[in-house]
Amino acid sequence: MKFTIVFAGLLGVFLAPALANYNINVNDDNNNAGSGQQSVSVNNEHNVANVDNNNGWDSWNSIWDYGNGFAATRLFQKKTCIVHKMNKEVMPSIQSLDALVKEKKLQGKGPGGPPPKGLMYSVNPNKVDDLSKFGKNIANMCRGIPTYMAEEMQEASLFFYSGTCYTTSVLWIVDISFCGDTVEN
């Protein structure tokens, strides 16, 4: 009986961190560019990461749903939500997200480290009618606001793109740019 209790206790001690949610907060102490504060919450049980960028009216939040392969970003200034497929070759896995953020923060690299990977998306001007196909997390975040689908532009560069883009930079790991008419207004 004592063995069972000890075993259950040890199992709980070692299993709890693997299934728990964790939060990572990164403050931009040198807030010259007005990047504000970012926080990442990861729910390993549901395979979802939530990134919040708090910078006044230029704030946004993003959900990366690793379970269904979609991500959504809600742009508060534009009052829109943009959904796109996750490029798993560029975006960090949910397992490595914690390690990447801690490495950047603890080593003090921040914006001075290696350049972030970049993704560029073209936003379809037609509104999405059915949010349920993207999963309940994305549907809940985007419910009640205009939502658009975006397609990744392969081999694209902001340097050569002449249209208007809105760029979200996630913890110096990945820059995601949304380009098209819906981000101009």
Curated annotation (Swiss-Prot):
Q: Which Pfam families match?
A: BRICHOS
Q: Which PROSITE patterns match?
A: BRICHOS
Organism from which the protein derives: Homo sapiens (Human)
The biological process GO terms on file are: digestion; positive regulation of cell division; positive regulation of cell population proliferation; regulation of cell population proliferation
What protein am I looking at? Gastrokine-1
Q: Kindly list the GO molecular function terms attached to this UniProt entry.
A: growth factor activity
Record-annotated disulphide pairs: 81-142
Q: Keyword set for this entry?
A: Disulfide bond, Golgi apparatus, Mitogen, Secreted, Signal
Q: In which tissues is it expressed?
A: Expressed in stomach (at protein level). No expression is detected in cancer tissue or gastric cancer cell lines.
**Subcellular localization(s) per the UniProt record:** Secreted; Cytoplasmic granule; Golgi apparatus
At the highest ranks, the source species' classification is: Eukaryota, Metazoa, Chordata, Craniata, Vertebrata
The family note in this entry says:
Belongs to the gastrokine family.
Give the range the annotation lists for the signal sequence: 1-20
Q: Where is the BRICHOS domain?
A: 54-150
Function of the molecule: Has mitogenic activity and may be involved in maintaining the integrity of the gastric mucosal epithelium.
Q: Give any Gene Ontology cellular component.
A: extracellular region
Name the InterPro entries on file: BRICHOS_dom, Gastrokine
